[in-house]
Amino acid sequence: MAVVVSIDAGTTGVRSFALDETGQQLALSYQEFTQHYPNPGWVEHDPTEIWNAVKFTLSELNDRINEPIAAIGITNQRETVVAWDRKTGEPLCNAIVWQDLRTSDRCEQLLELGHLDQIRQTTGLLLNPYFTATKIEWLLHNNVVENNSNLAFGTIDSWLLWKLTDGSSYATDVSNASRTLLYDIKENHWSSEICELFGIPESALPEVLPSSGRFGTTSATTAIGAGIPVSGIAGDQQSALFGQACLEPGMTKNTYGTGSFVLMNAGSECPDPAEGLLTTVAWDLGNGPTYALEGSIFVTGAAIQWLRDGLGVISHASEISDLAASVPDNGGVFFVPAFAGLGSPWWDTRARGTIIGITGGTQRGHLARAVVEAIAFQTRDVVEAMSRAAGTPIGEMRVDGGASVMDLLLQIQANQLGVRVARPIITETTAQGAAMLAGLAEGVWSETGEIHSAWRLDKAFDPQSDRKAYDTEHERWLQALDRSRFWVD
């Protein structure tokens, strides 16, 4: 039996995942790591703690499967940047996380200086603190790291690849590179002009390789043993698109995680920039890039965590579905979870969270339902922008991620979108996608048709009939969203 392992280094923890050649999950191990908030709007991770979580989960997984491992894939939270010393292999500071807002003013300055069009046309992205470039610039400008020949920057995948191979491989894949704000997605290389704009030396950036192919082999110091090929890498959302078998243009998925990320396969031609959306590289199987349109929603699952940890409305995240279903509607309450501003399609870093419509009759259930509905409303906003850009509505949305277990959410989502929402049997599609990219490179699967065959439906949610009522709810949501915008000076 061929076994492929995937390391999924997310925003709040690491999952290591094993599957066989039929695409069936064999084992899963998970380890959380600490979130650091040193200043308002700042979010950091300890790279060593992430690496230790990887070692722990790989060791636990290895004990469970007792089979030789054919390949390893890596998928990761994107945009988050690690700086380390190539000589010692040690991090130079905490990683700056994708949610971090410390470079908001710098992004505003670059907008005022007229750099948006150059950035947009070259990278497919926007000037926003979400992306990696201004984080690296901040580290250099504030002398947190010293610019010398030993300096290495990388997204989480590069850091883990370095550690897995004991420093013999310093690389990333094209999907992660395309999220840095430094990569020319049409010419497929680091942009010298953009690197110069941010004062970032190209020598401190990793080699960019296809998403499926040999990146290196594990060293004897890893918890899983030496000589195992690391043969697939993709950013978490692109990996989920692949794991959902969205391999044809127009196929669309949404991952409900800390945030939610809607991606549509755009084919082999790089699409023009679309209002409110990002153009990104989905993957490269060795024959050139496949592109995607993306809508990035910053806060969805994190809002459920806030109900639990911030307000104490629920004790466990799993309670929210029953609590939201305990009331027939939201009671006029709308919640805009703009904790870190708004992402697609609004891109407003000055927006802040808003709860509106509270009365003396508002109950815990109404607040819970407003949180669940906010996930669906934000997704609808992105999908409508995506349909306008593509010139055609989507036909189906495939879903995954932690909140996809909530039938109530998926039914509300189908009602708001007016299309079928399909949940697969395996909802760990982020990890599954990276494993499949690695397995393709090592011959576990010989063609993408086998990836299609591995996707299996668990449950479909078709839209219910009251379209006018759903549109009215969405219009009220947009009114609430407007109240949240441009709050911070």
Residue ranges and their predicted role:
Residues 112-128, 226-233, 251-253, 440-454:
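A polyampholytic, Gly/Pro-enriched intrinsically disordered region
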Residues 175-288, 292, 298-302, 315-324, ...:
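ATP-dependent carbohydrate kinase catalytic cores
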Residues 29-67:
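N-terminal phosphate-binding loop and adjacent alpha-helix
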Residues 33-44, 118-121, 171-178, 359-366:
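Gly-rich Lys/Arg/Thr-decorated short loops/hinges at beta-loop-alpha junctions or inter-strand turns
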Residues 77, 133-136, 157-158, 234-239, ...:
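Conserved glycosyltransferase catalytic-site signature
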Residues 1-30, 37, 70-113, 169, ...:
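Glycine/Thr-rich phosphate-binding loops that ligate phosphate moieties of nucleotide
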Residues 9-11, 22, 119-237, 292, ...:
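Gly/Ser/Thr-rich active-site cleft segment
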